[in-house]
Amino acid sequence: MKNRQNRQKKAQPLPVLFICISVLPAVILTLMFTIWPTVQALYLSFTNATSLGLNNKFVALDNYIYMFHDKSFIQALINTAKLMAVVPVITIFCSLVLAFVLNQCKLKEMVLYRTLFYFPNIVSLTVVGIIWSFVFHPNVGIVNKILGAVGLESLQRSWLGDSKTALWCIAFTLLWQAAGYYMVMHIAAMDGISPEIYESATLDGASAWRKLISIAMPLMKDIIGITFVLALSGTINLSFVLSQVMTGGGPNGASSVLLQYMYTQGFVNGNFGYAMAITVFTLAISVALSMLSRKLTDASEGGQ
């Protein structure tokens, strides 16, 4: 009996050792490709590092101070704020409408429609940007072709070359690309709403619009809050690719966004220190949104 107990005591450390060995590769990769680059970016943001990497000097907060005196950065920040104020709201609303229609209309082709609406999210964002660049092209683009066909030639323009419309073309492309993704999440939430609630509303004479506004949305407020924060974060990240592919930040910075301006400073102008300061600033915004998302998730779980 004593020998068996001694063997069990000796065997206890083995599972712990096995767990440590199993986790070690993930820890090493996280340190190499996440923690260390983040620390290095934070350090470089306090230096005047350039692409040559010579004579990097510690400049303290100079990059951050200059950031808010840089008109191009301010323009990129304002453009990003505009997208964050408009795109998530419209995207979530459109995805809710699509989800409600597909949830209520019991069609045989339901799977097909869900797939079609979700498909833009599967396509590479670079490909999406190229496709919509052709759609908005002033000469061969379908937008100007349609306007010409219906006699609205006065509205034809170079959509991506006009400072008044370039940013909103990117916003529309973001909406088209992301609506299907959030639609799937909202459909999953709507499937959890009892059909009896909708039936009672129908007997009371409620329209489909009233069911969406007064029944579905209040019951889904937690998941809507989460998807809204995800849409905010996605707008920051995805707008960079579309801005770079569709307009390159032009014309004259009219469609430049934070990450696109960071890319220009770091990889075009070679101002790595300043680019890293912009990166850290953008990262701080993303972390704040992630914390808000986690808070909403915890609140949702606590209410269930």
Question: Model-derived features: where do they sit?
Answer:
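A structural signal for multi-pass alpha-helical bundles of membrane permease subunits
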Residues: 11-304
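Short, Lys/Arg-rich, polar N-terminal cytosolic tail immediately upstream
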Residues: 1-13
